[in-house]
């Protein structure tokens, strides 16, 4: 029951109308019995500073930050965690004792959640795409002690930046998607992670396509785990294609839930909610 004493947590981004975070976070808050609600607030670039400064002064207990503000919000935080600095992105804020914003990033822990029990130590991985999501994925794979990561992208400069930032921690190579070596890498890979938006259910994207086209995947075999960060549609065309090849598949819903659980713990000073509470709420919604 919402009352005059109810506090709130908010998602800040543009757009936010598609977000599933209010569904899963409100299920978790209800489970905990907290007098808190989770809402989504659309916010344009030029309004970000005004909105965040205003939220300090009212009953806001924390924020999620999404596109396009994950980098811009750095300038509005007085404290930034080491992982957020490494990833160059913040997705979670809370007010510290001085009533200033403290920022972190929960995407790495979200990403590795479904991989923790798969023993990927010293294994080889391919990461498709070189944008912001790829940074979280690469850091997660480093944390899981893989031996080699190959980043495949259409963007040479962003691949070079990833190698500069992460290449001292793991054997990391970058290739354009047209490189002839790609087929051998796919054949050898223990894990392929798609961080591109190809296959996502939006007005801009055709859903029944594979990242980099059908021929790119011809050497995929059944020993490879295929992890698509996209969670809508479920399963994606890539995951259906991979399952037909005999591959183990993982969709992005587990990452979404796991990073959300970490954000909730950050806001509530360590309170924990069972994974299935958020996961079931999303599955019932979808």
Swiss-Prot record:
Catalysed reaction equations from the record: shikimate + NADP(+) = 3-dehydroshikimate + NADPH + H(+)
Chain positions recorded as shikimate binding sites: 19-21, 66, 91, 107, 231
UniProt-annotated binding residues for NADP(+): 129-133, 229, 252
Gene Ontology cellular-component annotations: cytosol
Pfam families: SDH_C, Shikimate_DH, Shikimate_dh_N
Catalytic residue positions: 70
Pathway assigned in UniProt: Metabolic intermediate biosynthesis; chorismate biosynthesis; chorismate from D-erythrose 4-phosphate and phosphoenolpyruvate: step 4/7
GO biological process: amino acid biosynthetic process; aromatic amino acid family biosynthetic process; chorismate biosynthetic process; shikimate metabolic process
InterPro entries: Aminoacid_DH-like_N_sf (IPR046346), NAD(P)-bd_dom_sf (IPR036291), SDH_C (IPR041121), Shikimate_DH (IPR011342), Shikimate_DH-bd_N (IPR013708), Shikimate_DH_fam (IPR022893), Shikm_DH/Glu-tRNA_Rdtase (IPR006151)
Oligomer and partners: Homodimer.
Family designation: Belongs to the shikimate dehydrogenase family.
HAMAP family attached to this UniProt entry: Shikimate_DH_AroE
Designated name of the protein: Shikimate dehydrogenase (NADP(+))
Gene encoding the protein: aroE
């Amino acid at each position: 029951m919402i009352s005059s004493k109810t506090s709130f947590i908010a998602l800040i981004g543009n757009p936010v109308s598609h977000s599933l975070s209010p569904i899963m976070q409100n299920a978790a808050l209800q489970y905990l019995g907290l007098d808190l609600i989770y809402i989504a607030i659309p916010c344009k670039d030029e309004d970000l500073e005004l909105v965040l400064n205003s939220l300090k002064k009212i009953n806001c207990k924390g924020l999620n930050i999404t596109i396009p503000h994950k980098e811009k919000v750095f300038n509005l935080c007085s404290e930034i965690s080491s992982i957020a600095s490494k990833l160059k992105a913040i997705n979670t804020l809370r007010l510290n004792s001085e009533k200033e914003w403290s920022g972190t990033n929960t995407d790495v822990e979200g990403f590795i959640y479904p991989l923790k029990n798969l023993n990927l130590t010293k294994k080889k991985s391919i990461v498709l795409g070189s944008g912001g999501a790829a940074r979280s994925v690469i850091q997660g794979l480093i944390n899981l002690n893989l031996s080699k990561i190959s980043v495949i992208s259409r963007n040479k400069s962003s691949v070079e930046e990833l190698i500069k930032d992460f290449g001292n921690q793991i054997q990391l190579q970058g290739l354009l998607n047209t490189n002839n070596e790609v087929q051998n890498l796919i054949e050898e890979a223990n894990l392929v992670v798609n961080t591109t938006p190809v296959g996502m259910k939006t007005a801009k994207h055709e859903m029944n396509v594979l990242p980099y086209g059908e021929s790119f995947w011809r050497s995929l075999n059944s020993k490879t785990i295929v992890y698509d960060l996209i969670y809508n549609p479920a399963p994606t065309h890539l995951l259906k294609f991979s399952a037909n090849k005999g591959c183990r598949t993982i969709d992005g819903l587990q990452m979404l839930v796991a990073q959300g659980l970490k954000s909730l713990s950050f806001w509530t000073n360590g309170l924990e909610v069972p994974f299935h509470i958020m996961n079931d709420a999303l599955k019932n919604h979808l």
